[in-house]
Amino acid sequence: MTAQSQNIVETPSRVRAHALGVNAPELAKYQDEPAQMRSGAVGKSGYLKLRFAKREHCSILAEMERRVPSLVQKALYWDEEIPELPCVTMISTSGCILQGDRLATDVHVEAGACAHVTTQSATKVHMMNANYASQIQNFIVEEGGYLEFMSDPLIPHRNSRFITDTTISIHPTATAIYSEVLMSGRKYHHADERFGFDVYSSRVAAQNLAGKELFVEKYVLEPKVESLDAVGVMQTFDAFGNVILLTPKEHHDRILARVPAHFDIKGGDCQRRDAST
């Protein structure tokens, strides 16, 4: 067993990232291996582990582990409204997500700590002629913790296939904000780029720290099988944003009152809110 294989076996989220798409029905047609380099090989099995802890005057990035092509360098404190908030930018040394990539991220916010995690720029899922790319994300937010995970948009190129699975484990007193933004593609690059990807599959689940399920949502987009321009799907819009807020009820009600539902087809703006406690 190689050193990389041993490290993968010893890291549950990396094991899941390698296995995620194997039995997924939506990816059954895309199990062939790339001719250039096999899936999950060195440089194609990325991993990030970030652990945030509370100190006297601020929270810190107390532990970090990284495997190419995933990279984090250090936490910065640039939020003037929350000066004790460590802000971390995730970087891809490959520039984009490629066929055969297997990516995993573990973020742990300890009791009373806070963190903001984002990306360096929009994430591009490159054109593919074999296999697919997969991603596992695990977030743990302990008692009184606060996590913002606000990634930049994901842009799937034509003929790309991407599957992502996110699990948020959270204490009832903690708060987590998670967002994902999906673009229609490089619509000004080529006529076939707008909704030209093969598969986009996303699953997001939340649970308490004891493992009790709070919610699960999954959607699979296959624009070459069924048009996404239909009414009730994307219609004429080119960006889909999904923001999930998990917070104690006293915060939830106050925030919800300030975020009304909104639909403006001429202005290209549609905002729907789903209330749950």
From Swiss-Prot:
Belongs to the UreD family. One of its GO terms (molecular function) is nickel cation binding. This is Urease accessory protein UreD. UreD, UreF and UreG form a complex that acts as a GTP-hydrolysis-dependent molecular chaperone, activating the urease apoprotein by helping to assemble the nickel containing metallocenter of UreC. The UreE protein probably delivers the nickel. The keyword Cytoplasm applies. It is found in: Cytoplasm. Keywords: Chaperone, Cytoplasm, Nickel insertion. GO terms for cellular component: cytoplasm. InterPro entries: UreD. Required for maturation of urease via the functional incorporation of the urease nickel metallocenter.
